Amino acid sequence: DLAGDFADPHGTHIVCFHAVLEALKQIKSEGDEWIKDCWLWLYKGAWEEWNIDEIQMAIPMSPDQVLRKRHGIFIHQSQKDMVPFQGSDAREFWQRVEVRNANTARLYADLGLTHYAAMEAFVRWEY
């Protein structure tokens, strides 16, 4: 998966997206068979979520999985404590992510689906 928040004011997400996309296109053009089974899934980022009608895959998370995700975020130095590009939101990265994922789970519950602790949403990028 890859961040699909191309409105990132510092351009990090779009630079990474283009690097991954070019690598995938190169592998595809070289005819490697395994690439036919690879899909590129984009998550939105810490600040926003995809609109519910845009989401193509949603991964439900239990409270334990939310904690594991938080610990995964802590592993990345750029996402710990005060991040270099904080923006106007004073919360730490993991706090924004957990609220976003909980809100997505609530949206699905409001539609009549099972209510989970959190849900990560993805959109597939065709390359």
Task: Mark where each language-model region is.
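Metal-dependent de-N-acetylase/amidase catalytic core
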Residues: D1-Y127
